[in-house]
Every structure is written in C-alpha cells, then in structure tokens.
Design a protein with these regions (language model features):
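C-terminal regulatory/oligomerization modules of transcriptional regulators
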Residues: 98-160
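Conserved segment of winged-helix/HTH DNA-binding domains
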Residues: 73-98, 109, 113-118
Length: 160
C-alpha cells in the first residue's frame, strides 16, 4: 500500500499552516501548530527541526519566535517536504540505489512500476504548498494557468 508516513503528513500540514499565515506575518510556534491540528508536540518539533535543517523553514528566536517558510509557498513542492522528512520516495526495491532484487532478471513489472513511480514523483513535484494552502487549484508551470485540482485534471496530467 502506498502511504505517506505520519511524519510526512504532519510536515505537510505544518508547512501548509505556515503558508497560510497572512503576508510575511509572524512566526508560528511548534506548540501553536501542534495544538491547531492535534499533532504530538515532541514529534512535530523534530519534524520542524528537520525542515529547518534542509532549508525549507527558518526559525525565529525569542518569545514571539517560531518558524517561517524560507521560500515563498509557490516555490516549495510537496515532494520537497516529503523528501526532507522521509528521504526519497521508493515504490519498490528496484528503484533504490542498489536497484536489485531476486526477481531482477525475470521481472515483468519493473517497467510499469517505474512509470507509476515517475508519475507519483512528477505529481508531488508539481503540487506546491501555495496550492495546498489556497483555493484547491493546480497551477500549471508551463502556462501559469490555474485549473481545478480534480480527478479529471489529474487524469489529464496522465497521473491517474
């Protein structure tokens, strides 16, 4: 079953929360975000530290400090957040650095699974945090046009 880890899910929620902060407004604390979404604070604090170390967030020290996005939300993809927390997305062992399994020589599903893997990566790379925080539209990089973020739209991108 393909599934985001809880850490990646919480990371996306936190980054989306920060993207929804008005303007270049105040920083949001880990506690504020954890309380807003019912996320365990110690776990969220570790996730936010990881996102800070990878350059997606920066921390603001002080009593009114917290975390802010290091880049504009339209410049951060869902894939970047997931990768920062969990590392590369690996659908099967044949997509690891070693790329070998017991069935490598006789495998009949490697190529179809590679296509699925690439489609997932491509889609996650195209979904920005801005889109996640906004009106549910998918902004197409080629044209800049916004289209409804629907099943039909995903099918037209050849990812469903």
């Amino acid at each position: 079953m393909l599934k985001l880890t809880k850490k990646a899910d919480y990371g996306l929620i936190a980054v989306r929360h920060l993207a929804a902060m008005p303007g270049n407004g105040r920083a949001a604390s880990a506690k504020e975000i954890a309380d807003a979404y019912g996320i365990p604070l110690p776990l969220l604090a570790k996730i936010l530290q990881k996102l800070t170390k990878t350059g997606l967030l920066f921390s603001v020290p002080g009593s009114s400090g917290g975390y802010k996005l290091a880049r504009r939300p339209e410049k951060i993809s869902a894939l970047e957040v997931i990768h920062a927390i969990d590392g590369p997305i690996i659908l099967t062992t044949c997509f690891t650095a070693h790329g070998h399994c017991d069935q490598s020589e006789k495998c009949t599903v490697r190529e179809p699974l590679r296509k699925v893997h690439e489609a997932i990566i491509h889609l996650l790379d195209r979904i920005t945090i801005s889109e996640m925080a906004g009106d549910g539209s998918l902004c197409l990089p080629e044209t800049g046009a916004k289209t409804p973020f629907t099943t039909e739209r995903l099918e037209s991108l050849h990812v469903l």
